[in-house]
From Swiss-Prot:
One Pfam short name: Ribosomal_L19
Superkingdom of origin organism: Bacteria
Role summary: This protein is located at the 30S-50S ribosomal subunit interface and may play a role in the structure and function of the aminoacyl-tRNA binding site.
Similarity comment: family membership: Belongs to the bacterial ribosomal protein bL19 family.
NCBIfam families for this protein: rplS_bact (TIGR01024)
Protein name: Large ribosomal subunit protein bL19
Keywords: Ribonucleoprotein, Ribosomal protein
GO molecular-function term, one example from the UniProt record: structural constituent of ribosome
A GO cellular component entry from the record: cytosolic large ribosomal subunit
Organism: Pseudoalteromonas translucida (strain TAC 125)
Keyword check for Lipid biosynthesis: no
């Protein structure tokens, strides 16, 4: 019985997975278009920053994007397969040697820069 329930849950989750998510990782600069509802109107809001973490868990996958806005660091966690995310565009590939870039939180200015990956 438990196996049947697992198969049903897996089928439902597979149905909701997005297929148009590009391949990106920590260190990449991305632009996330988020659907924002204000009253009766719905519009797209762009959030551009560096991916500092990525969590791969199927339907529950998420990624954290960090940007500097008016001299203040802003981080936002996005659910990869959320219906509120319209699109994710990779602007720049970063050459990093870590999976999680939490050390960027303590850095500012030139020391917070990431080298571009040369292909």
């Amino acid at each position: 019985m438990a196996k049947v329930n697992q198969n049903i849950i897996k089928a439902l989750e597979d149905e909701q997975l997005k297929t148009d998510v590009p391949a990106f990782g920590a260190g990449d600069t991305v632009v996330v278009q988020v659907k924002v509802k204000e009253g009766a109107k719905e519009r797209l809001q762009a959030f551009e920053g560096v991916v500092i973490a990525k969590r791969n868990r199927g339907l529950h996958s998420a990624f954290t994007v960090r940007k500097i806005s008016n001299g203040e660091g802003v981080e936002r966690v996005f659910q990869t397969h959320s219906p509120l995310i319209d699109s994710v565009t990779v602007k720049r590939r970063g050459a990093v040697r870590r999976a999680k870039l939490y050390y960027l939180r303590e850095r500012s200015g030139k020391s917070a820069r990431i080298r571009e990956k040369l292909n």
